[in-house]
Amino acid sequence: MGKLFGTDGVRGVANSELTPELAFKLGRAGAYVLSKEAPQPRIVIGKDTRISGDMLEAALIAGITSVGGEALPVGVLPTPGIAYLTRKLKATAGVVISASHNPVADNGIKFFSASGFKLPDAVEEEIERYVLGEKGQSLDNVGGDAEGRHDDGLPAPTGALVGRVRPVADAETLFVEYLKSTVPVDFSGLKVVVDGANGAAYQVAPRILRELGAEVVTICCTPDGTNINDGCGSTHPEKLCEAVVAHGAHVGLAHDGDADRLIAVDEKGRIVDGDRIMVTCALHMKAKGQLPKDTVAVTVMSNMGLHLALKRAGIRILETKVGDRYVLEALLREGASFGGEQSGHILFLQHNTTGDGVLTGLQLLTVLKETGKPLSELAAQMEQLPQLLVNVRVKDKGCMNAPEAQAAVEAGKAKLAGRGRILVRPSGTEPLIRVMGEGPDPEELKQVVEAIADVFRRF
């Protein structure tokens, strides 16, 4: 990773780490790097519901237009919507302003290429070099010269060559209609509770389901700029579990702040995580002959039960590092199209280029309609081994390499040898060390994982 770009773009506390000045520089450098061959780059810009989104959007637009780019703001829309619209509108690039499932104080800036995919590391590194002044001069010096270039070496167009802002008024409808086109059935007779996390899906998700015939109950779909992910959404599905039972719904669908992930709840109020969603969809696609290469890509965080369920069905599994970008790389490399993460980032590459929580919900409901089976029965196709994940906040994620920490991890692995596993990794977006364990005995598993977590808590 670079100094600015992490596993999912640039993130930080808005107006403190991720400042308007930095957003301006990212917009300016990003538009230039991504559009060297375009006479006037066109950049789609979307955001979630965070209060800082407007501030950062204004700065990004200023940066984009300052190099002659055309800014196409689409307003509040899920991250995968930006990826889709970048392709649909034949734009040069797309930018999302969101920190996904992070707290409201955080925000982020992530770029998509013209094809709707996340940027390769090399391209992010080039943008970063311009922003940090490691390529030419620092972008702190923004005065132009007589030859139409700024002191940073980037274009300084004047007059009619300055970029324009052209809002896309029908952006939401374009995305909604596309998502509806991926569904071969209607959802009449289904009652669905949607938890929008007070985020980017708060309008889109309920609208699509209603237009497809479902009866929809919404919770946490009233954003006020400060309540995104606040005790709700895919990282806090407890309210959704209660609501599904209270309303007698067939299923609950929980998104995160930018709606690139989905966690479901069955009719009994039980959580159905990304692993079980993937097993449900993969087995259905395999039965219909619609699973390319009979292959699914998952990360090392996926439960061992997923491996057993898919292998029984003759499905090949590609295992990657944690992060949907690595799942994507594996799928593209192998010519496959389906995979994801236990956290609910799930990719259907035949439909979109990135994890899409709303799309995943539609595909899951399609399985319910086509099989006539309740979600509890479909999810039971995978027997989940006991798994425990503990997140430990640390000052320096480098503590993973400390001898004391490594000794604790090795001791834990030794205790579960042959019966389970331990996986310890740093978060790519937060100052956390994640300690995950799987094993047959929940009590023993808790003791082993907590012993490791206690060591990290000392750092």
Curated annotation (Swiss-Prot):
Cofactor requirements of the protein: Mg(2+)
InterPro entries found in the cross-reference section: A-D-PHexomutase_a/b/a-I, A-D-PHexomutase_a/b/a-I/II/III, A-D-PHexomutase_a/b/a-II, A-D-PHexomutase_a/b/a-III, A-D-PHexomutase_C, A-D-PHexomutase_C_sf, A-D-PHexomutase_CS, Alpha-D-phosphohexomutase_SF
Catalytic activity: alpha-D-glucosamine 1-phosphate = D-glucosamine 6-phosphate
Residue(s) carrying Phosphoserine: S100
Disulfide bonds: none
GO cellular component: cytosol
Coiled coil: none
An annotated Gene Ontology molecular function: phosphoglucosamine mutase activity
Gene3D superfamilies: Alpha-D-Glucose-1,6-Bisphosphate, subunit A, domain 3, Alpha-D-phosphohexomutase, C-terminal domain
Post-translational modification: Activated by phosphorylation.
Entry-linked CDD domains: GlmM (cd05802)
Cofactor note: Binds 1 Mg(2+) ion per subunit.
Any one GO BP annotation for this protein: peptidoglycan biosynthetic process
Positions that bind Mg(2+): S100, D256, D258, D260
Entry similarity comment: Belongs to the phosphohexose mutase family.
Role noted for this protein: Catalyzes the conversion of glucosamine-6-phosphate to glucosamine-1-phosphate.
The protein's name: Phosphoglucosamine mutase
Native organism taxonomy: Bacteria, Bacillati, Bacillota, Clostridia, Eubacteriales
Gene name linked to the record: glmM
